[in-house]
């Protein structure tokens, strides 16, 4: 299954050899760019409440182990992080520099993907390349440009990360000979499986945080009975309209079928019009196509901007009680996320079914640190990433999440980040956003557009058939 997933993601938009042909990328590239640019801007807006002042990031609750001594040795790192993210990364790796005497040289660029591939193919790679998604990392491994981190690191991650096996799989790719190795060390995660709400409204109405999907549906029904509207949902996003619906689908798939089926769905070994996928779509429809459930009625979902949707939590009276969206959405709140610091907004885990026996699945993303040029100091740096202290150093600065079960949760900069960190550490399954792993014509094309049609009243079977037809057309 892992190998099939790699073959699928090789067709992704981030495969650099396709960058040169803009006609191939077309609207798919622009639509995905629209989505990612908006997200990046909102993450920047969230820093105001997601970070704190710090005296010394290296003063962490956990003690840093012996990292060895590498005075004067240089480790080159390439990535896409800029601005505050770059500053926080450099603050964090300074702890490794102080402990070992090594020197980190980081080069960040918005054109990271094109630059790192050019450097690797010209035999001038960095020691470490930080990939924001697994597709391009898998391609570089298949071309022989990456060096395995090692089975010992994979075993460590399996034992010490929440949903450790999932993270190992995410960083495991085939080499030039088709043999699987562990290449990608996940460090710094993003979480999508969240439901936002107003603590004041929940308290005033006597509502409790649901622990299961059954309870979430019961809570939604109770809200309707009380004269309240449970959900704000919007899928409009310009050229990227529909992507929020795909996130709903992905979260529901993880709660209604196995992780193995999710992987088969990503690679289309499980057809889009299979019963498992149609069931997930219909459950999403239970939330999004129910006039009693949605602020503005079901017909408003397709035309409501995803950025405007959560604002209903803060109107007086509120037009909805809950909004499912990833952590970045706070940047779209009326006060750009200051509501969280004031206690006016909070989030809880999008829960699993009690009856499904599928554990605690989480949908999200994560950056992958890979080795492209070996050295003893570089090997030591990957050991550093295993240290709880390396995670706590960034946790203290803010806007950082980790699945490291040994990291001290008290190091998180805010209570909300701490709560999200607990969700990741307690996860039993983690999966990357499926639409980002599918070929661009599907994940940023038919999946988006057909889910928009679903929001406009198209039935689930037709929607699923149309997406499967798009898959068949590119095989």
Residue ranges and their predicted role:
Residues 56-69, 134-193, 244:
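Hinge/lid segment of periplasmic solute-binding proteins
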Residues 1-11:
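Single conserved hydrophobic/aromatic residue that forms the stacking wall/gate
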Residues 94, 121, 318, 325-328, ...:
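Extracytoplasmic/periplasmic substrate-recognition and gating elements
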Residues 220-222, 266-302, 350:
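Glycine-centered hinge/linker elements that transmit conformational signals in sensory
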Residues 118, 126-127, 158-200, 357-362, ...:
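A structural signal for short loop-to-beta-strand junctions that line the ligand-binding cleft
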Residues 174-187, 193, 217-270:
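Extracytoplasmic/periplasmic solute-binding protein
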Residues 56-63, 68-70, 74, 203, ...:
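Conserved C-terminal helix/tail region of periplasmic/extracytoplasmic solute-binding proteins
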Residues 91-167, 200-211, 312, 321-322, ...:
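Extracytoplasmic "Venus flytrap"/periplasmic binding protein-like
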């Amino acid at each position: 299954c892992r190998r099939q997933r790699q073959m699928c993601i090789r067709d992704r938009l981030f495969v650099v050899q396709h960058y040169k042909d803009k006609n191939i990328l077309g609207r798919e590239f622009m639509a995905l760019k629209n989505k990612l640019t908006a997200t990046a801007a909102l993450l920047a807006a969230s820093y105001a409440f997601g970070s704190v002042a710090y005296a010394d990031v290296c003063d962490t609750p956990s003690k840093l182990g012996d990292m060895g001594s590498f005075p004067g040795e240089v480790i080159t790192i390439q990535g896409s992080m800029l601005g505050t993210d770059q500053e926080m990364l450099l603050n964090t790796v300074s702890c490794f520099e102080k402990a070992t005497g090594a020197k980190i040289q980081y080069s960040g660029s918005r054109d990271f993907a094109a630059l790192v591939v050019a450097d690797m193919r010209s035999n001038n790679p960095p020691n470490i390349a930080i990939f924001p998604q697994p597709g391009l990392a898998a391609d570089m491994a298949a071309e022989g440009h990456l060096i395995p981190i090692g089975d010992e690191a994979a075993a460590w991650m399996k034992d010490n990360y929440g949903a450790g096996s999932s993270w190992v799989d995410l960083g495991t790719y085939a080499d030039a000979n088709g043999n699987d190795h562990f290449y990608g060390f996940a460090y710094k995660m993003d979480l999508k499986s969240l439901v936002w709400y107003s603590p004041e409204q929940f308290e005033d109405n006597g509502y409790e945080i649901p622990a299961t999907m059954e309870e979430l549906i019961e809570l939604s029904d109770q809200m309707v009975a009380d004269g309240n509207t449970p959900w704000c949902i919007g899928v409009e996003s310009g050229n990227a309209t529909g992507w929020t619906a795909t996130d709903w689908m992905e979260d529901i798939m993880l709660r209604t079928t196995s992780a193995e089926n999710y992987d088969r769905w990503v690679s289309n070994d499980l057809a889009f019009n299979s019963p498992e996928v149609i069931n997930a779509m219909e459950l999403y429809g239970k939330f999004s196509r129910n006039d009693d459930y949605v602020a503005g009625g079901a017909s408003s979902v397709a035309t409501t901007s995803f950025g405007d949707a959560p604002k209903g939590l803060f109107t007086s009276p509120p037009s909805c009680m809950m909004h499912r969206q990833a952590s970045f959405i706070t940047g779209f709140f009326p006060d750009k996320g200051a509501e969280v610091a004031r206690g006016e907004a909070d989030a809880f885990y999008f829960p699993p079914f009690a009856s499904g026996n599928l554990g605690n699945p989480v949908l999200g993303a994560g950056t992958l640190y890979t080795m492209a040029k070996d050295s003893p100091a570089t090997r030591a740096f990957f050991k550093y990433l295993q240290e709880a202290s390396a995670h706590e150093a960034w946790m203290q600065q803010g806007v950082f999440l980790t699945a490291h079960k040994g990291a001290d949760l008290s190091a998180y900069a805010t209570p909300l980040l701490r709560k999200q960190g607990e969700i990741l550490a307690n996860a039993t399954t983690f999966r990357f956003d499926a639409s980002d792993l599918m070929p661009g014509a599907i994940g940023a094309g038919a999946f988006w557009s057909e889910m928009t049609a679903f929001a406009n009243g198209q039935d689930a079977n037709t929607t699923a058939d149309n997406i499967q037809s798009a898959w068949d057309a590119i095989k």
